[in-house]
């Protein structure tokens, strides 16, 4: 599977400007790419004022993603602020080339920023089937909770989209590698750049690790599109040879 990671600065609470920047990046991606991954809250930055910028699932950004996915024959994923029945969600949407959508609502809301006070938490993770791959998409703070991401579904690829600040970037790098190793899964992390309106600095470090924790794409610190191709056959062969997942402890989340 050929995957493109888009790492960019985000304009605070300005969906139109962010869509324009992202679309320019997408238009420069060569054909034959299977999946494009955007950061967390890619239209707004990590704002705790959702009432200013929230959209619906029939809103402009969703329609824009569907139009691009169809035109480019590529899947696109990332999270944005969605409002439903008066509740706000930090929602990852996975738009297929057909325009069909699957979604995941962030389970672990970032209490340090007060996200839990304004957003509604998701209840379960989602595994998406796409081109013969099983993909588990998660959002930012979810990365710190390995029990939630435990690979009981035999997924092939973990995706984390984030607004992860410079002050804790070492944790981002370390935990992405750990999630790859413990779940024997390719793991992608896509983060943003720039400074937000809370004066938090972001230095990117978007990256890809393989199922043994080895770097496929090293942490990146510049604006751009970073592309790699993942090999499912090698993943399967390694899992057969090193079948660590069969020895994991069995338990359920309450």
Each model region followed by its residue ranges:
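Extreme N-terminal starter segment of soluble prokaryotic enzymes
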Residues: 1-5
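Short polar catalytic/cofactor-binding loops
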Residues: 7-13
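Cys-nucleophile CN-hydrolase/nitrilase-fold catalytic domain and related Cys-dependent amidase chemistry
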Residues: 15-16, 23-100, 165-178, 185
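Structural motif
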Residues: 34-35, 135, 157
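Active-site catalytic loop in hydrolytic enzyme cores
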Residues: 55, 83-153, 167-174, 237-244, ...
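CN hydrolase (nitrilase-like) catalytic-core segments centered on the catalytic cysteine
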Residues: 60-74, 144-225
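Short beta-strand scaffold segments in enzyme catalytic cores
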Residues: 78-80, 91-94, 126, 189, ...
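Long hydrophobic alpha-helical segments typical of transmembrane helices together
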Residues: 202-254
